[in-house]
Amino acid sequence: ILISNNNTISTMESCTGGGVSNAITNIEGSSSIFKFGAVTYSNEYKIKMGVNSDIIDEYSVYSMETANEMSKKISDFTISDYGIGITGKINRIDNNNLFGEDNRVFISIYDRNMNKFYNSEVITTDGSRSYNKDIIINNVIEMLLGILK
């Protein structure tokens, strides 16, 4: 759908580790629509990519506010029609970021042309990290398809 609409997309992923970028680039012809994928696993690199540190400090890195910052900043950085931001905790305690609920992931898709955020939360299971990443990635792709239709 992105290809036929001549839209572009970029991602800033944390807990999915580039899985959404991988899913998009598995589609033949995706080079015409996929501009950039960043895996910003640490706060430092989220901030270097433009995420406002005050947002992280006020709401935590594991928040919809941070996911929104990620999706908008990656769209702005790459001048993409859509930006995807994903942050959250999967099956673990993060000693560097003590706030936020375990097994809760925040997904934001920013539509640059409409200046609009589409948001979703996924509650993961106690299954493996790989299994939970697949659930999140599938949710993002389904969400994106719903926006584009």
Regions found by a protein language model. Name each.
Residues 1-149:
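Short alpha-helical segments enriched in small residues
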